[in-house]
Amino acid sequence: MTNKTWGGRFKKSLDSSVNQFNASLSFDHVLFDQDINGSQVHVKQLAKQKILTEAECQGIYSALEEIRTEIKQGQYSFNERDEEDIHMFIEQLLIQKIGDLGKKLHTGRSRNDQVALDLRLYTRDKGCLINELLTRLIDCLDDLTSKHQQDLMPGYTHLQQAQPVALGAYFNAYQCMFGRDKSRLDDWFKRMNYSPLGAGALAGSTLPLDREWVAESLGFAGIIPNTLDAVSDRDFVIELCSVAAMIMMHLSRLCEDLILWSTQEFNFVILDDAFATGSSLMPNKKNPDVPELIRGKSGRVYGHLMAILTVMKGLPLAYNKDMQEDKEGLFDTINTIIACLQMITPFLQSLTFNTLLMKTKAQSGYLDATAILESLVMKGMPFRNAHHQVGAWIAEAIEKQCSLNELLKGG
């Protein structure tokens, strides 16, 4: 008979290569805090429902708290262990501490609803942190919007000079984009904040569990009523990865502009020494590594989103082992976006904007062409005729190497 917790019907031990291939402890150990929180509320529920005694509940609860402290203190290694995942790891530690009483922890529970709970608690915690960091970025952009309301710069389409805009309007555009991202994150939170615990493997439990009490105790808005749905979907993971990809896309576009602006050709932005790097060969270099890395990291977040979508696309109800593949991409997505959001705000605050040069560039060239066109329209000229006329003037001004205003005044 195998020594696995599920090994009652098995006559052979699990092949060591299968055990290694099957294991997720090396990466899902980050869920230990959420796993213990869920287990402590679960065991309280078992006592409340008279399935365990109060003394049994207290013994399990206290031992779990000891395990939490020991893990935080670094007393355990998560590599080269026999336990398959963080859930079994904690349960085995519990049994080592309090004997057979520890074997009662899993009463009325499956790892299917347990891991679904842990993931919801984890993504909720990290989602709140992402929201907080996003709010800081939006506030920073609001400050830059106010500071640069009157500072003119060239606006671009197709990366060609188009019309004058305020530098403050530029920052406000990104403030609006990240504001919508925050709204998406808020909407995600409302949808995901429901408890799967009590769904069991897929069909609930015959024990008199109080799912609503557990949900309330863990800070959820309610329960996921359909037990099949509760354990079988990872749409909340996909949606968070999707929102993260959207945020990273906006960060990448912002960083692309700042990278261009920091070149000698633009010279709109001066990088702070504390947020730039040099070259191992060229002593003249001052490199924008921070925005380049943020721009680059958007690719890995996109990749994780496509990976989890692909994992989930062909799975029959309910739980399948494929769903173990949801975690590494999710964890890396969360770590990546947190790191980028923690970096972008102080980076923006460190920049010096060459507003005098921006204004000069905005007032040179032919950025006033659209305003002149519309002034002709206001005098009664048909739009297409006005467009053609201003285009002809621009061609003449280019030939004479003068501005549009100089040409018109001279005429």
UniProtKB/Swiss-Prot annotation:
GO CC terms: cytosol
Q: Which GO terms describe its molecular function?
A: argininosuccinate lyase activity
Q: Which reaction does it catalyse?
A: 2-(N(omega)-L-arginino)succinate = fumarate + L-arginine
Write out the coiled-coil annotation as residue ranges: none
The record's section on PROSITE patterns has: FUMARATE_LYASES
Question: Does the UniProt entry include the keyword Cytoplasm?
Answer: yes
The family database entries (CDD domains) matched by this protein are listed as: Argininosuccinate_lyase
Which Pfam families does the record associate with it?
A: ASL_C2 (PF14698), Lyase_1 (PF00206)
Question: Where does this one sit in the cell?
Answer: Cytoplasm
Task: Print the keywords alphabetically.
Answer: Amino-acid biosynthesis, Arginine biosynthesis, Cytoplasm, Lyase
Q: Which family does it belong to?
A: Belongs to the lyase 1 family. Argininosuccinate lyase subfamily.
HAMAP family for the chain:
Arg_succ_lyase (MF_00006)
What's the protein here called?
A: Argininosuccinate lyase
